[in-house]
Amino acid sequence: MTDLNKVVKELEALGIYDVKEVVYNPSYEQLFEEETKPGLEGFEKGTLTTTGAVAVDTGIFTGRSPKDKYIVLDEKTKDTVWWTSETAKNDNKPMNQATWQSLKDLVTNQLSRKRLFVVDGFCGASEHDRIAVRIVTEVAWQAHFVKNMFIRPTEEQLKNFEPDFVVMNGSKVTNPNWKEQGLNSENFVAFNLTERIQLIGGTWYGGEMKKGMFSMMNYFLPLKGVGAMHCSANVGKDGDVAIFFGLSGTGKTTLSTDPKRELIGDDEHGWDDVGIFNFEGGCYAKTIHLSEENEPDIYHAIRRDALLENVVVRSDGSVDFDDGSKTENTRVSYPIYHIDNIVKPVSRAGHATKVIFLTADAFGVLPPVSKLTPEQTKYYFLSGFTAKLAGTERGITEPTPTFSACFGAAFLTLHPTQYAEVLVKRMQAAGAEAYLVNTGWNGTGKRISIKDTRGIIDAILDGSIEKAEMGELPIFNLAIPKALPGVDSAILDPRDTYADKAQWQSKAEDLAGRFVKNFVKYATNEEGKALIAAGPKA
C-alpha cells in the first residue's frame, strides 16, 4: 500500500493544505462511480453511453489553448528553450517568476480544502528515460483521462513512487490579474522546468495534460541525445520497426494500425539506445465520422473504461459520431490494451529501420512516394509540410499550406534543428531509410486512394521499394519509383496525372517557393544554411 500520509505531506510541500480526502490512483470501477454519481453538475458530470463508455463535455475549450501556454524564463530555460520571436513565432511564451507564483497560489488555493484525486503514472516506456508524473485534480473524469493516457505503474512501483513532475489541474479557477500581467487571457497552461510543475487554469480540455507532458519530454530527452517524436510506430513479425510522422489528417493513426503488424503507439515516441518506446499508456483518437467499417479497431475500443469528449449523446444514450455541432475535434481516450494487436506488456521495440513522413499535399505536386537522402530527411522533417483544401465563398476549393516543424511544432520546446539532428543520428546508427509519402491529391483532382497508399506502405515495409527502378522528379529532385507491386504505376510520377504537364510545372514552382520562404527561419545557423541545397529549387 502507498502511504497516504506521505502523499498528503508532498501535497503540502506544493502549497495544497487541509485536503479533505485523497483518492489515490483510483481503480476504473471507482472512477466510473465517481464520474457518473448523482449531483455532479456542469463539466464535472459524466454521461453513460450505450457503448459502455462515459462521455464528458469540456465547454468552450474543445482543443488545446496554445495562446495561453507559457514557460517560466529562468537560468535553466533562458538559453535552452526555443522562445517565440518576431521572426519565428511559436507557442513558447516567457513568463516571469512573480506571475508564476501568483498562478501557483491561485491553483493551490483552489485545490486546498478539497477532496482530491491523485494519479501517479509514467510518461515513457523506457525505464531510463521515463518521467514519473503526478497529476492532482478535483475532477474525477480528469483522473480517468490521465489513468488512460499515462503508463499505469504496478503496485510494486507505486510503493516507492517519487514524482519527477507534477501537473496541478485547477480548471475551475481563472486568473483575474491577467491584463496587468500581460497575459493573453484569464486561462493559463504554464510550465516551470526548474520546479518541474505544470499549472492548468480555466480550460477543461483533457489534452492539455497529455500534450503538456509531451512538451516536457520534448525538452528533457533531446538534451541527452534521446529522440522525442510526434509519430506513430509499429513492428512487424520479424521485429522490424517503422515510425510514421505526420500532422493531423495525414493518416498517422490509420496507416500505423495494420493487421500484419503490432502497434507500439499512435502519437508520441522516444528513440533511445535500445530502440523505439511509447510515451503513453493509451490512445487519444478522433471520433468525428467514426464508423465500424472504416476504423474497426478504434470503434471497438470505445467501451467501458474509455472516455468520450464532446460527442453528441442522443436521449437513448447512443452516440452520434457524425454530429460535429460541439466541435469537429471530438475525441476518445482509452487504455492501449483496448486495441488487440499491440506490443505488450511494454510498449517498446527495437530501432526503427523505416521512417515515413506523411503529408497530404492538396496542391497536387508531390509524388505518392519518394526516397529521401539524409539531407532531404532533415529538410522535410524541419519543413513538416501538409496542406488542406479550404472552401472559399465562391465554392472554389483552394489549398492552404501548413508548415509545422518536425511535424509537431506546437509541442517543441527546443530549437527544431536539435530534433532533426537527433533523428538523423539515430537513423544513421540503425541504418534506417526515410520516405516521403503523399496521402493527398494529384492532377486528377482526386485524393490518392487508401488502397494505393497502403500498397506503397507495404512496399516500403517489405523492402520491395528498394528493388524498384528509380527516376527523379525535377524542381524537388526527389527519387521516385517507376513501378511498385499493388500500386497503380500511372500515379507514381505526379506529372503523369495531369493532362498538361505544364500545369504540374507551374504548381510545382509555386509550392517550391512556399517551401523556400518557410525555410528561411532555419537558415539562421550553419546547420540550417547547409540544408537549403536539399530543398526544392524555386
Curated annotation (Swiss-Prot):
One of its GO terms (molecular function) is phosphoenolpyruvate carboxykinase (ATP) activity. Keywords: ATP-binding, Cytoplasm, Decarboxylase, Gluconeogenesis, Lyase, Manganese, Metal-binding, Nucleotide-binding. Its EC number is 4.1.1.49. Its cofactor is Mn(2+). Gene3D superfamilies: 3.90.228.20, Phosphoenolpyruvate Carboxykinase, domain 1, Phosphoenolpyruvate Carboxykinase, domain 2. GO terms for biological process: gluconeogenesis. Pathway: Carbohydrate biosynthesis; gluconeogenesis. It catalyses: oxaloacetate + ATP = phosphoenolpyruvate + ADP + CO2. It is found in: Cytoplasm. It is an enzyme of class 4 (lyase). Substrate binds at R64, Y205, K211, R331. One of its GO terms (cellular component) is cytosol. Binds 1 Mn(2+) ion per subunit. Its main location: cytoplasm. Mn(2+) binds at K211, H230, D267. ATP binds at residues 211, 230, 246-254, 295, 331, 447-448, 453. PANTHER family: PHOSPHOENOLPYRUVATE CARBOXYKINASE (ATP), PHOSPHOENOLPYRUVATE CARBOXYKINASE ATP. Involved in the gluconeogenesis. Catalyzes the conversion of oxaloacetate (OAA) to phosphoenolpyruvate (PEP) through direct phosphoryl transfer between the nucleoside triphosphate and OAA. Belongs to the phosphoenolpyruvate carboxykinase (ATP) family. Monomer. NCBIfam families: pckA, PRK09344.1-1, PRK09344.1-2, PRK09344.1-3. This is Phosphoenolpyruvate carboxykinase (ATP). It comes from Haemophilus influenzae (strain 86-028NP). The gene is pckA.
